[in-house]
Amino acid sequence: MYRIKDEWGEFLVRLARRAVEEYVRHKRVIEPPEDTPTELWEKMGVFVTLNRHNVPPQMALRGCIGFPLPIYPLVEATIKAAIYAAVDDPRFPPVQPEELDELTVEVSVLTPPELVEGPPEGRPKKIKVGRDGLLIEKGIYSGLLLPQVPVEWGWDEEEFLAQTCWKAGLPPDCWLDPDTKVYRFTAEIFEEEYPRGPVRRKPLV
């Protein structure tokens, strides 16, 4: 059962696109639209991903920022994440206006992270590539990878754990440390088929 209706997913992708374009072109932060569905004012975690169109998945990423925890109303979090993905992702220079025609927008709405219990060596059996995203925390370090990432890169569960450790700035075997907390979550993902094109629900498998 989906939490996010297809039309809500399309609304969020269009909103994220408008937030990016208005900020990149005019440095203007848009307000949530008056016709925002009531349900999208609920607090939820969300990530916005900007991808270069017609580029292999491993090379397409142009920016991805979001909020793992439900701390903002979804409509507000989507606007914030979209702008941050465009101009504040430390891995990339800010998006320029001339790039906007070549970027597709993807919105991932997250379930709250759930702690993976049990001995560390059993963690790969408790997650599933094609369903789960991962959040890893140890001390001051944390890293998150969305559910679509291991699918796009062809990873198995152990590699997914190792890559999330690396994303957190930790050794790739940190998931075997009992002091490392591993959380899993799922996401409903909506994407433009091409820049400013139709919006579809993205299948993971």
From Swiss-Prot:
Gene3D superfamilies: Hypothetical protein ph0010, domain 1, Hypothetical protein ph0010, domain 2
Domain AMMECR1, first and last residues per copy: 7-201
Name the UniProt record assigns to this protein: Protein TK0174
InterPro entries the record matches: AMMECR1, AMMECR1_dom_sf, AMMECR1_domain, AMMECR1_N, AmmeMemoSam_A, Uncharacterised_MJ0810
